[in-house]
């Protein structure tokens, strides 16, 4: 797609892929011959080559990172991300097979690889651009289903259906791009140093509609509907949550004077019936789908901003010579469309924390499988280690867990940052007898306890407390949960849960506080 195209003849072909014809000319209506070549400006060639080379390299590396992020992280292997990978593959193919030759044509000013390769190169250009926008069209439909039917989405959009949709994208792209290779084009020019896509009017109209304008209309309609549904659903879910919260009589923190057994029974009954659970599930799933729709909306918006100027300027310049933009402006518009290929790898980590973490792991050469082996070893050794220090101010329950799920070489205690949770102060009688050193509870290999509960004995009336000071201050049991497949890091893998029931030096006080790894 060389912007130095002679558009003196009236044609409806918006030759929007590949370098356009008459690339090696010095005036608007001059064409070169086999014996005349433009003189190469070395300084300009080096500067333009470095800029375009850096751009192409960034596009290649960025799209490879997107593909590896989904391939190496099981929790990212969702139907939506399959469409993102397909988009990255189209951009990567464009960066490998089209952009280097477009840059060479821009630097040299003429085509050097012959007529046959010119036709193949132009067809691949059409193929990649069409696959990109059809992938965005499939993404917009997927996001509408995800927002409109958030609870039914896993059954409506399965992995098999997503793969079939991706195959359809490439089949349609091939049908649109293969026409010139089968003879649907105007006669080839005599000069092999001229290279461009066909300007045959019917093919130009067919390719323009099928590759850009019809998919663009579908994308805009889908995202308008996504916005309307998201706005209405958000209002309904928020109203439902507020209503359930006003009708609910459950309290997370209960202050009462009943004994520990009665309160435990009431807590168990409360867990069995939660009127807000269905609303919470709907709100969580919908918010997740809406966030994904926002990220992909940015991708679609940038695609339109990059390609729309080109698809407006080129047809108008081809049909009406007076509306043709200056060569410098047209070159900027032309490369702006190609620039879209390196934008998506920037958008994903900036809009998605999951992609950002995946990019960091890949760039840091961190093996995902090695992290899973470490977590399995941690679970075999007991999961989490707790330390109770009764004579600190207010007392504290300290939890030691590595943020990267790592164990020290000795296999005794888990390494990592210390997390503290306020607990109860010990009784004066306990301190008066001379308190023992802090109890260090470490994850030894022989621990095989199936449950977890850290609790203090039920508070006694003030008159009888002194008789029971010789009893244990608390009891401890350990729990490890199986790793949920497809989760990342330590936020929900394995993990530990504990309920701390503390006396706090006051009779009748109780606090239930669940602990989850990474949530303090």
UniProtKB/Swiss-Prot annotation:
Localized where? Nucleus membrane; Cell membrane; Cytoplasm; Membrane, Caveola
- What is the disulfide pattern of this chain? 118-195
* InterPro entries, per the entry: ADR_fam, ADRA1B_rcpt, GPCR_Rhodpsn, GPCR_Rhodpsn_7TM
Q: Which GO terms describe its biological process?
A: adenylate cyclase-activating adrenergic receptor signaling pathway; adenylate cyclase-modulating G protein-coupled receptor signaling pathway; cell-cell signaling; G protein-coupled receptor signaling pathway; intracellular signal transduction; neuron-glial cell signaling; phospholipase C-activating G protein-coupled receptor signaling pathway; positive regulation of cytosolic calcium ion concentration
* Cytoplasmic topological domain: 71-83, 142-161, 225-295, 352-520
Q: Name one GO molecular function term.
A: protein heterodimerization activity
Q: Where is this motif: Nuclear localization signal?
A: 368-380
Concerning PANTHER family, the annotation shows: ADRENERGIC RECEPTOR-RELATED G-PROTEIN COUPLED RECEPTOR (PTHR24248), ALPHA-1B ADRENERGIC RECEPTOR (PTHR24248:SF17)
Tell me how this protein assembles: Homo- and heterooligomer. Heterooligomerizes with ADRA1B homooligomers in cardiac myocytes. Interacts with CAVIN4.
Official protein name in the record = Alpha-1B adrenergic receptor
Source species, please? Homo sapiens (Human)
Gene symbol of the encoding locus: ADRA1B
């Amino acid at each position: 797609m060389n912007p130095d195209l002679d558009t003196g003849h009236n044609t409806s072909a918006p030759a929007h892929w590949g370098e356009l014809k008459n690339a090696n000319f010095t005036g608007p209506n001059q064409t070169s011959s086999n014996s005349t070549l433009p003189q190469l400006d070395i300084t300009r060639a080096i500067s333009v080559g470095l800029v375009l080379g850096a751009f192409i390299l960034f596009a290649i590396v960025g799209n490879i990172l997107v593909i590896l992020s989904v391939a190496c992280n099981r929790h990212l292997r969702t139907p939506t991300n399959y469409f993102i990978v397909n988009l990255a593959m189209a951009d990567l193919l464009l960066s490998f097979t089209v952009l280097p030759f477009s840059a060479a044509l821009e630097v040299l000013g003429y085509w050097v690889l012959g007529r046959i390769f010119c036709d193949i190169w132009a067809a691949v250009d059409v193929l990649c651009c069409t696959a990109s926008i059809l992938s965005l069209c499939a993404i917009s439909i997927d996001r509408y289903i995800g927002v409109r039917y958030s609870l039914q989405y896993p059954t409506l959009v399965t992995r098999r259906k997503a793969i079939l949709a991706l195959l359809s994208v490439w089949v349609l792209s091939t049908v649109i791009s293969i026409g010139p290779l089968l003879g649907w084009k105007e006669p080839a020019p005599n000069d092999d140093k001229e290279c461009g896509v066909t300007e045959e009017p019917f093919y130009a109209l067919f390719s323009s509609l099928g590759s850009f304008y019809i998919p663009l209309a579908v994308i805009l309609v889908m995202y308008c509907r996504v916005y309307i549904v998201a706005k209405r659903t958000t209002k309904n879910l928020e109203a439902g949550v507020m209503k359930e919260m006003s009708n609910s009589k459950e309290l997370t923190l209960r202050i009462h004077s009943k004994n520990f057994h009665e309160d435990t029974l009431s807590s168990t009954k409360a867990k069995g019936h939660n009127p807000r659970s269905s609303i919470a599930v709907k709100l969580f799933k919908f918010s997740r789908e809406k966030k994904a729709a926002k990220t992909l909306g940015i991708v679609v918006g940038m695609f339109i901003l990059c390609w729309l100027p080109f698809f407006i300027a080129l047809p108008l310049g081809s049909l009406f010579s007076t509306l043709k933009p200056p060569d410098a402006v047209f070159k900027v518009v032309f490369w702006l469309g190609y620039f879209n290929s390196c934008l998506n790898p920037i958008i994903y980590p900036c809009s998605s924390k999951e992609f950002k973490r995946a990019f960091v792991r890949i760039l840091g050469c961190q093996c995902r499988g090695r992290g899973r082996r470490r977590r399995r070893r941690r679970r075999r050794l007991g999961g989490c280690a707790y330390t109770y220090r009764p004579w600190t101010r207010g007392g504290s329950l300290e939890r030691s867990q590595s943020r990267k799920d790592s164990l020290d070489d000795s296999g005794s205690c888990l390494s990592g940052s210390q997390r503290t949770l306020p607990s109860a102060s010990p009784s004066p009688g306990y301190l008066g007898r001379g308190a023992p050193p802090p109890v260090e509870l470490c994850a030894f290999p022989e621990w095989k306890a199936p449950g977890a509960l850290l609790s203090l004995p039920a508070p006694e009336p003030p008159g009888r407390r002194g008789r029971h000071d010789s009893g244990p201050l608390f009891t401890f049991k350990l729990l490890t949960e199986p790793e949920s497949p497809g989760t990342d890091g330590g936020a929900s893998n394995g993990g530990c849960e504990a309920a701390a029931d503390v006396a706090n030096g006051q009779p009748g006080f109780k606090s239930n506080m669940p602990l989850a790894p990474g949530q303090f």
